[in-house]
Amino acid sequence: MMKKAGYQTAIIGKWHLGLESPNLPNERGFDFFHGFLGDMMDDYNTHLRRGFNYMRLNTEEIDPQGHATDLFTDWASDYIFKARKQDKPFFLYLAYNAPHSPLQPPVEWEKKVRKRHPNISETRGKLVALIEHMDDGVGRVINSLEKSGQLDNTLIIFCSDNGGDRKSEANNGPVRGDKGDMYDGGIKVACSLYWKGHLEHRRVNNLVMMSDIFPTLCDLVQLPVNHRIDGISVLPLLRNQEQVTDDRYLFWVRREHGDIGGKTQNAVRYKEYKLLQNRPFEPLQYFNMKQDSKESQPLEKDAVYSKLYKAMVEHYRISGAIPWQRPLTK
């Protein structure tokens, strides 16, 4: 869609949407790909996943040297300067795999953390260092935008794909659950936006989804969306206007994790009410999130519960099964 609006499109970093044709980045709307086809790396420095090398420059297999976070930062900065020379604006999706396990920050970054916090645990220290290293990379990318004269006309969106992982000693604050859960600790994350000279410095607590990013960008570039999508444009919210974003059903589904036996984890929310099944072998739980943000006191079934349940079932029907990609064999 961004290409229809005249944009050059690129993805740097983690793809995780397919390992072979027709599910490769260059076949899915991106003019340029420099990154990793897989999900997580077994090592941030060898970049291998179960013995396979999924690093690519477009479709060419490559074997770059260095920490993955530094590589993705450098590649994004290089792209920004090259894109500046073209006569078209650019859309860049930069996907770091940090701070996903394995927790392998560069040694010098871990030393900085332990110098400040000598009593920090081994695991927590590595996690903090991995995040700070990535944060430095984001800063370097923003500096590249500024040096290339493109910061003033670039909207930057930064967010996480899930809540922190307690096995890595992440801290999700007072909310229940962590990565992999349907509780808010697993699915509710902060999102930061920056557009120099266009967005006020402020905080809003509206509920928005990752799926809202696409229609928002289309709205921003005045590109109509004529097919069914799940998200809504939140451009009025960015323009400091009042906007209701929770007057709709919001869905979360997870199908991929091995310990759920091919079944699903699900959640649906409407305004302050939330219905979830955190594991397919556990009962449904129903919460009022305004009164019980820690999701500790399930409610009894009522009319709203019935509406949420029907919406969840309808979402099953519309979404259907998702075919798995054929696994590669070595």
Predicted feature descriptions by range:
Residues 1-285, 289, 293-330:
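Formylglycine-dependent sulfatase
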